[in-house]
């Protein structure tokens, strides 16, 4: 597919991408609980017409598109995470979270929408590539050890020649991509910080070691 024609196809998909992203944003689900999210993605992928859809894990999803173009066949995987965070959304957007205490605050709704758009572009460009495009919707990225381990153990990336991960970033201007070969922000972890102090009267802060103030400064 020529570069200009592909760019025009992407721009034509913008309204649909926005609709996908806003739907996902309105109905966020926490790690390992993405049942409705995965069901929505599966319905959309079926409508798009991908060649194969698999559920290798309870809430993970893999879609495959096979190309019929000339050249050496290769299997290229693209991964997007789909889970939300356990935090409230404090705005009045028409597509704000409808789930109390849960929101897409890390862009995973956008990631999933982009991967759906890629699926549609690839289905319409089968003759432009040879081999397989494997689209992996990863559950539970936010909660270690995460859904990636489950997908790996389930064989979701077996036979993949090259793998692309993606993440939105406020470090770049709109429309700008940053690319790095190898590992980049490929781990997540949690830790607790314990602040010890000695409380006292707020009128005499100099006579106590207030743990609240210390924690706020940490």
Residue ranges of model-derived segments:
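Histidine/acidic-residue-rich, glycine-tolerant segments that coordinate divalent metal ions
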Residues: 62, 85-87, 91-103, 109-110, ...
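Acidic/His- and Gly-rich active-site-bordering loop/insert found
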Residues: 2-104, 109, 113-129
């Amino acid at each position: 597919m020529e570069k200009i024609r592909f760019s025009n196809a992407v721009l034509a998909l913008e309204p649909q991408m926005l609709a996908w992203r806003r739907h996902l944003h309105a109905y966020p689900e926490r790690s390992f609980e993405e049942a409705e999210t995965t069901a929505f993605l599966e319905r959309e992928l079926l409508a798009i017409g991908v060649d194969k859809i698999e559920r290798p894990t309870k809430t993970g999803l893999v879609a495959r598109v096979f190309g019929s173009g000339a050249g050496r066949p290769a299997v290229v995987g693209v991964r997007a995470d789909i889970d939300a965070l356990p935090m409230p959304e404090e705005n009045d957007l028409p597509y704000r979270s409808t789930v109390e205490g849960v929101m897409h605050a890390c862009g995973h709704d956008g990631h999933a929408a982009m991967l759906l758009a890629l699926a549609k572009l690839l289905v319409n460009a089968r003759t432009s590539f040879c081999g397989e495009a494997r689209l992996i919707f990863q559950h539970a990225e936010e909660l270690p050890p995460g859904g990636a381990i489950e997908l790996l153990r389930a064989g979701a990336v077996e036979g993949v020649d090259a793998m692309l991960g993606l993440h939105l970033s406020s470090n770049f201007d709109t429309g700008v991509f940053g690319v790095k070969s190898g590992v980049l922000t490929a781990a997540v972890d949690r830790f607790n910080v314990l602040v010890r102090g000695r409380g006292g009267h707020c009128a005499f802060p100099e006579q106590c070691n207030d743990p609240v103030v210390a924690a706020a400064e940490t």
